[in-house]
Amino acid sequence: MLEGVIRESITKANAKALKKDGYLIANVYGKGVENVSCAFKLNPFIKYLKEKKHLIFPVKLGDKTFEVVVQEYQKNPVTNELIHVDLLAVTKGVKSKFKVPVKYQGTPVGLKNKGILMLSKKRISVECAPEHLPNHYLVDVAPLDVNESILVRDLEKHENVKILDHDSIAVIGVIKAK
């Protein structure tokens, strides 16, 4: 389980001092949950996120434990280092909006015909209760030829999960190389 510290002071000087000590500044918020300003050790946080199996994961802040999902993050545009992360605390049975990653498998037929695979949408916006949240959408790209794409409406439908993105948006496709 990922452990963090609750920030008592939310001043700019305090945030700078924490960053200098190797901490990542974060906020935990959600429906029915009081906002918590906190900080996590940067390297263990990144390692934990890479190894986790589910979108929802537990964090411990002080004596409280929250089930959270990464809602948004900010990176330094030059160094590409994480600066800040927003964590949405989820409550069982309460619908929330999430962004679910798209993963693809296979090698498109169109790559042999001088095509390039274009991942247009890396995440799909959905609304559901946390217990129905899919970990990812898996797309088989093997049958795709040049100028073909998979749209949001072609994705696998999950029960009790409402996709918020428009049906005609391309998720992944093969375009002709110039």
Swiss-Prot record:
InterPro entries to which the protein is assigned, alphabetical: Rbsml_bL25/Gln-tRNA_synth_N (IPR020056), Ribosomal_bL25/Gln-tRNA_synth (IPR011035), Ribosomal_bL25_b-dom (IPR020057), Ribosomal_bL25_C (IPR037121), Ribosomal_bL25_long (IPR001021), Ribosomal_L25_dom (IPR029751), Ribosomal_uL5_bac-type (IPR020930)
Coiled-coil regions, chain positions: none
Q: Name one GO molecular function term.
A: 5S rRNA binding
Name the family.
Answer: Belongs to the bacterial ribosomal protein bL25 family. CTC subfamily.
Q: State the name under which the record lists this protein.
A: Large ribosomal subunit protein bL25
Q: SUPFAM superfamilies this protein is in?
A: Ribosomal protein L25-like
- State if Transmembrane helix is listed as a keyword: no
Question: Which GO terms fall under biological process for this protein?
Answer: translation
Q: Which organism is it from?
A: Helicobacter acinonychis (strain Sheeba)
Q: Does the keyword rRNA-binding apply?
A: yes
Which proteins does it associate with, and in what oligomeric form?
Part of the 50S ribosomal subunit; part of the 5S rRNA/L5/L18/L25 subcomplex. Contacts the 5S rRNA. Binds to the 5S rRNA independently of L5 and L18.
Protein's job: This is one of the proteins that binds to the 5S RNA in the ribosome where it forms part of the central protuberance.
- GO cellular component terms listed in the entry, alphabetical order: cytosolic large ribosomal subunit
* Keyword tags: Ribonucleoprotein, Ribosomal protein, RNA-binding, rRNA-binding
